[in-house]
């Protein structure tokens, strides 16, 4: 029977081999496919930003942060809102089309970099693509519905299993999961005003390389190791952000007894959110 979805990015995946009907985490097949599409479109955008950098053109912080948040949004249990993923895919496509217009060399770009969610019929009548996708993002009725149908169809073709060679597939996904972890460090560092163009550029160039069918297994292994190395740089950036903003942790005595006062249970490690909560 054909899989309704395929996801094996967490340690709790069904049968230790992959969720194919429904996510153990609670993720639906529709949501899993839309996450696949978000990763696919983010790879395409990253290929364009990498090419822009090669041409000596600047990539804005807004674009860097869009890519970071796209990756972060797909990590296990981060977000289960279908509509969020539709909107992020549309925003990513709109951003990519805007940047493609600034790109001098469009030779040999991948299908992911060029795909735009507009049908051939609409292209034939010279639809204003950027306007159309932005209209869809804003929710203009019929246009939004048509775009969503195209996204749904595309999402069934770009998942993990689209790479047929198991070894290549596994290495690509290992790299992508490393980049997702890196995006978490970057997202939290960005929230405190810290950033790194070098890490952003690496993440995007590496995403683009997962589209390259010419890379060998040895080259992908080397890229996996490099991803781990840059991941340590991401951890260092986050540590600098945390300690630079809040100081270094100190051994502190706290009351662990029970009182009648209301309390707030905090889970996670977004210190900026915790700071804002404590200030309320």
Locate predicted features:
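Metallocofactor- and cofactor-centric catalytic cores in central/energy metabolism, strongly enriched
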Residues: 2-280
């Amino acid at each position: 029977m054909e899989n309704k979805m395929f996801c094996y990015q967490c340690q709790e995946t069904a049968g230790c081999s992959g969720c194919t009907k429904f996510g153990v985490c609670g993720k639906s097949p529709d949501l899993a496919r839309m996450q696949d599409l978000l990763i696919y479109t983010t790879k395409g955008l990253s290929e364009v930003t990498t090419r822009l950098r090669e041409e000596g053109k600047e990539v804005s912080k807004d674009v860097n942060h869009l890519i970071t948040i796209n990756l972060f949004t797909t990590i296990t249990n981060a977000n289960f809102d279908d509509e969020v993923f539709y909107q992020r895919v549309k925003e990513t496509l709109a951003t990519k089309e805007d940047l493609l217009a600034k790109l001098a060399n469009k030779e040999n770009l991948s299908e992911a970099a060029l795909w735009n969610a507009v049908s051939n019929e609409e292209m034939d009548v010279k639809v204003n693509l950027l306007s159309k996708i932005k209209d869809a993002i804003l929710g203009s009725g019929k246009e939004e519905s048509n775009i969503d149908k195209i996204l749904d169809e595309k999402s069934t073709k770009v998942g993990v299993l689209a790479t047929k060679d198991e070894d290549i597939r596994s290495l690509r996904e290992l790299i992508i999961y490393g980049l997702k972890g890196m995006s978490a460090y970057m997202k939290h560092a960005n929230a405190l005003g810290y950033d790194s163009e070098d890490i952003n550029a690496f993440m995007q160039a590496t995403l683009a390389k997962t589209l390259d069918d010419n890379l060998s297994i040895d080259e992908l292994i080397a890229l996996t190791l490099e991803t781990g190395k840059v991941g340590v740089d991401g951890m260092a950036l986050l540590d600098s952000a945390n300690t630079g903003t809040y100081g270094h942790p100190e051994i502190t005595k706290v009351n662990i007894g029970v009182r009648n006062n209301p309390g707030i249970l905090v889970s996670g490690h977004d210190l900026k959110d915790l700071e804002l909560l404590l200030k309320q």
